[in-house]
Amino acid sequence: MQGTKNNIYTVSRLNGEVRQILEGQLGKIWLNGEISNFSSPSSGHWYLTLKDHSSQIRCAMFKGRNQTVSFKPINGQQVLVKGAISVYEPRGDYQLLIESMLPAGDGLLAQQFDALKMKLAAEGLFAADTKRPLPKNIQRIGVITSPTGAAIRDVLHVLARRDPSIEVIIYPTQVQGETAAQSICQAINIANQRLEVDVLLLTRGGGSLEDLWCFNSEALAHTIYNSALPVVSAVGHEVDTTISDYVADIRAPTPSAGAELLSQDSDNKAQKLATALSRLQQSAKHYQLKQERRLSLLEHRLQRQDPKRTLQQFEQRFDEMQLRLESALSNRLHILSRRQQLLASRLEQQSPKHKLAIEGNRLSYLASRLQDALQDKLSQSEQRIKYAAHQLETVSPLATLSRGYSITTDIHNQVVDSTDKLTIGDSLQTRLRHGQVISTVTQIKPLE
């Protein structure tokens, strides 16, 4: 015992270290489950339990986050949530702090899309150096779409207006439903076997995520990637993005835009625009993927150090204290009510009217003292919370940013505090109160 006394933990230290381990190793996770024990106290925070057939976990979603949820959760509802594991140290319980919540159906499609996107990116299907430029003199375009849809009408109209000399060969296919992805793959393979066109235009009109789901097929992604013919993906509206857009050689926001990219005017401007747009898109996608990974890392680091997390702990603890006080008051009043009934019964048996008056006054006095004590306790708790929030706000880096200051870091995420550390051409990142600015050093001036 003497040799191990330095390894003896306090309860607070143990809970704190468990919290650091869980938060540090798991990070952000997706969780699917059924809601139970849902409650929404006056603070606006949500507390609930997610469970499956054999296990459950406590969850909290604070007011700033749950305002973005488009529906009101109810017990028994299946949902998909994204959040981070944390430990509520005062009680030693681990819980999930929810950041976003979706109904189980839509959420699973979005999660499957993100997972497939990451997998294909890791396999190199989105790499910019694999993208093929469009042919310089396009004579025949193979259009892979439904022959009766609005997309083919838009494509034919644009081509007839811009370059009537272009010949169009339609490879009819399904563009929606369970067998649509297989049908599209077959059409692409047929076009590659015949080699009768210069380029392929894969297109359909807009729709919901479920309507466009066939264009998120892994098999279709590999078919496009292995195509000997260049492929332009023009699926949905401008806001719709599919896996076929990422893996195709060029992505057009709409069917009409795809037809414009493949048709030339007298100055051949469309061809030049398509090449420039392709390079820009691939560069932007590469940069986006890189920044998404970096942002995820920064969010994880900020989450571990964010003073808002501590404030949320205080708010959750305050909610629990308030519920306990309300419960204690209710129990106490119930006990007093039973006691009053007992006294009344005894008085009715003995008819001592003066004792009834004395006990009634004493009961009123006790109720008044109990109410005063409850109010004092609530006031003290509110003052402690406000004081703690103020202390956290004074040391928060976000408070500094809100006063007009900014924080500039280099590419290694090191704070830049002197021009001695800079050279012309360095890339800098400046964090503002709302957003950030990416800049390049073009001139260095010493402080005069």
Curated annotation (Swiss-Prot):
This is Exodeoxyribonuclease 7 large subunit. CDD domains: ExoVII_LU_OBF. It catalyses: Exonucleolytic cleavage in either 5'- to 3'- or 3'- to 5'-direction to yield nucleoside 5'-phosphates. Belongs to the XseA family. It comes from Shewanella baltica (strain OS185). Its EC number is 3.1.11.6. It is an enzyme of class 3 (hydrolase). It comes from the Bacteria.
